[in-house]
Design a protein with these regions (language model features):
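Basic, polar low-complexity surface loops/patches
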Residues: 1-240
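Single conserved hydrophobic/aromatic residue that forms the stacking wall/gate
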Residues: 238-250
Length: 250
C-alpha cells in the first residue's frame, strides 16, 4: 500500500498528520515520533522493515486495510539511523512538539532535522580515521564548473574550479576520487557529464540529489557565504591563487 494512492480525507487525524509531513519530505524516510517510539508507515515501513530486519505490523488508519507499520525505540534510534545512513538513505526526524499529557487534541508534530550521509555531526555515526564530505557539483551550459567539498563535522570546506578543457571530466573525477564524498548534490546540467556520472554510480555509490539550475544562484550563494562567515568579500576566504582543479578555499 503506497501512501500516494491513499485518499487523504479518509485517513484518521493522526495518520493524516503523518501524510502531510511525508508529502513535504518525499525523498526521506520519515521517523514519526509516537510516545517512546519512532514509527514508520506505508512504503517507509516496508522499506525499513526489510533493510533493518524489523517486524512489520499494521495500524488502524481510517481505511479498511491497516497501514503497514514498523518502529524503533527512541532511546536507541541512533543505532538504526546509522545503519540506514550507511545504506545511503536520508531520514527526516519528526518530534512531538507538545506534551501528549497536556494536549487536548492532536499532539503537535514537525520535522526538526534531516539526517543524510553527508551531514552527520554525531561522533557515534562517524568514522574516527576519515573525513565525511558532502560535495556540491555545478556544471553550466557555458562550460563553467565548480565543486565544493565540506566536512560539516569539522568545519572544513574546500572549493575547486576546474577550467573548461578537453580533460575537464578527468579533473572532476580526480577531485571526487580525492575526497570520496558520502553525499553529492549536483545541478541537472551536470547529469550530461556521462563519464562523471558513471564514476559516481560505479565507484562512489554515494547518495545523490539533483537540483534544478535555479537553485544555484551565484549572487544568492555569495551573499549567504559572506553572511555565514562574517566577511564582506569571498576573497577573504581564499587560501591560494589556484585557477584550476586545486582547492582554493579552506
Amino acid at each position: 500500500m503506497n501512501l500516494a494512492d491513499v485518499p487523504k480525507e479518509k485517513l484518521s487525524p493522526g495518520m493524516r498528520q503523518y501524510a502531510d509531513l511525508k508529502e513535504k519530505y518525499q525523498d526521506c524516510i520519515l521517523f514519526f515520533r509516537l510516545g517512546d517510539f519512532y514509527e514508520m508507515f506505508f512504503e517507509d515501513a516496508i522499506l525499513v522493515s526489510r533493510e533493518l530486519e524489523l517486524t512489520l505490523t499494521g495500524k488502524e488508519c481510517g481505511l479498511e486495510e491497516r497501514a503497514p507499520m514498523c518502529g524503533v525505540p527512541y532511546h536507541s534510534v541512533d543505532l538504526y539511523l546509522k545503519r540506514l545512513i550507511d545504506r545511503g538513505y536520508k531520514i527526516a526526524i519528526c518530534e512531538q512538539l507538545t506534551d501528549p499529557a497536556l494536549s487536548k487534541g492532536l499532539v503537535e508534530r514537525d520535522v526538526i532535522r534531516i539526517v543524510t550521509p553527508g551531514t552527520l555531526i554525531d561522533s557515534t555515526m562517524l568514522e574516527d580515521d576519515s573525513n565525511n564530505y558532502i560535495c556540491c557539483l555545478y556544471y553550466g551550459n557555458d562550460g563553467s564548473c565548480a565543486l565544493c567539498f565540506a566536512d560539516i563535522s569539522t568545519g572544513e570546506m574546500s572549493l575547486a574550479v576546474p577550467q573548461e578543457t578537453s580533460d575537464l571530466t578527468v579533473r572532476i573525477i580526480d577531485l571526487l576520487s580525492r575526497y570520496m564524498p558520502a553525499e553529492l548534490i549536483l545541478n541537472s546540467q551536470a547529469m550530461s557529464l556521462k563519464s562523471v556520472m558513471d564514476f559516481i554510480r560505479v565507484r562512489l555509490q554515494c547518495t545523490v540529489t539533483v537540483r534544478e539550475d535555479t537553485c544555484f544562484d551565484l549572487e544568492q550563494g555569495r551573499g549567504t557565504l559572506c553572511e555565514q562567515f562574517g566577511v564582506s568579500s569571498l576573497c577573504l576566504l581564499y587560501t591560494s591563487d589556484a585557477a584550476d582543479d586545486t582547492p582554493c578555499v579552506d
